[in-house]
């Protein structure tokens, strides 16, 4: 999609920051209007992160107007609010390609643009990186400004406070803009959210205005003692050493620009608190920012199937109905993980701990020690953030905690920061853990039940984003730990499948007349099955939707080497690279994990 110059005359002129700075201040409200309208037009067609970007239009315009980007560093925390930033930095005519194969990245990416100072996708990293950049600029004697824009719940994560704790002590020249829209993907939770609500309250805002009117403006900004006492209101940020300013209207472009200009050359760490409306300018998104956080397409070919997240949510409700010891935990992913119904039906058994994966896992440890049965729902890519807690606080103590690992494997359009392809490799080495890989939605249901009933340590069920294959959900039964299923009997070739590629593998097995086994468990492996198959076949193929290095195939390799089984093995999975964006089907095709690709990989390997 190209710019419609008649519809967006000012935006078409300001599609670079150099041109943006040529505009008069009086023209900026119209620019903000056109930028918001363009976002509405483009994202409604191309799909993608929607509401967050609408809420930061004025902030984005003001930052590029006041600061000398790209020399000055803008760091967008998490990054799903950066669509306006991309448009204003020369990528507007490509914005319809965002999240698509070979298109613009879903989030800021250093490889894509010099204006993207930090590649992001996960939350709460901006202040730490920004502090490092600020220190580097000071050491080099360069008058480079560093600004971190953080919001959408990212301030609740421990890493953000670790960085503020450091920045408040050393007083490096750093500006943190708190984009306070009262939301992550879901509603913000926790004591910090309550504290921000107090800061936003009418009473404190009125007090703030009265004090400002009583002070000479020049004196207000020159005398640090007056500044701190007049506007801090004992905010947590001022108590941590930041020079707190706000809260101010994050949609008043004139006010934002004036404030930025006044503090631009000030020394020390500032936190500017701006109150915004997620979904600003589009009433449905303003009224329901959770629904409109992302616009996505549903594949009509699987419209009659349940999503794996729905399977999990339904199972959770069934268990909670008869087991009051179940405690379900999510780190700010209630909607995406299929837990909305559960949270309403069983509020006393549900905890949203906000964006705090490390806390979520050790919180579950405390519950397990106390006799409860925690279920932690977590995305594969975010599980990485709680790795030490899993080892030190759960596995080492042999605590029975079930981890429902959503978005495992190829996730698709969110790209390399969100692909859930490392979990098998980083989980498999943990002693005592049980790892299950369902091949369909009913298997997922049975494995969740099996993991929940397992009482000898942690268990993991990893399942993909998207919809199942239409399998009927059967009554819950425990699966024997470490036991696989033969799905097809063939000759000479045995395909050991781990997870959701089973259907694709079946098509390949038919063409090759191969034996196909649904291994079900990555740990413990069904060693008796492998030994049996090794005596009946000449070739082994392992198949998984995850990285080959250290994954399920590596587990098979280790076993056959130790047992002196002299069979050639082909490991099929994802290579040693970060997986780019595209639909799940596109990525599987690129890496030859669709049925034809699997067949060809095996066929050509056998011919060598």
From Swiss-Prot:
It is an enzyme of class 2 (transferase). Its EC number is 2.2.1.7. GO terms for biological process: 1-deoxy-D-xylulose 5-phosphate biosynthetic process; isopentenyl diphosphate biosynthetic process, methylerythritol 4-phosphate pathway; terpenoid biosynthetic process; thiamine biosynthetic process. It catalyses: D-glyceraldehyde 3-phosphate + pyruvate + H(+) = 1-deoxy-D-xylulose 5-phosphate + CO2. Thiamine diphosphate binds at residues 80, 121-123, 153-154, 181, 282, 357. The keyword Transferase applies. SUPFAM superfamilies: Thiamin diphosphate-binding fold (THDP-binding), TK C-terminal domain-like. Pfam families: DXP_synthase_N, Transket_pyr, Transketolase_C. Its cofactor is Mg(2+); thiamine diphosphate. Transmembrane segments: none annotated. Keywords: Isoprene biosynthesis, Magnesium, Metal-binding, Thiamine biosynthesis, Thiamine pyrophosphate, Transferase. Mg(2+) binds at residues 152, 181. SMART domains: Transket_pyr. InterPro entries: Dxylulose-5-P_synthase (IPR005477), THDP-binding (IPR029061), Transketo_C/PFOR_II (IPR009014), Transketolase-like_Pyr-bd (IPR005475), Transketolase_BS (IPR020826), Transketolase_C (IPR033248). Catalyzes the acyloin condensation reaction between C atoms 2 and 3 of pyruvate and glyceraldehyde 3-phosphate to yield 1-deoxy-D-xylulose-5-phosphate (DXP). NCBIfam families: dxs, PRK05444.2-2. Belongs to the transketolase family. DXPS subfamily. This is 1-deoxy-D-xylulose-5-phosphate synthase. The lineage of its organism: Bacteria, Pseudomonadati, Pseudomonadota, Gammaproteobacteria, Enterobacterales.
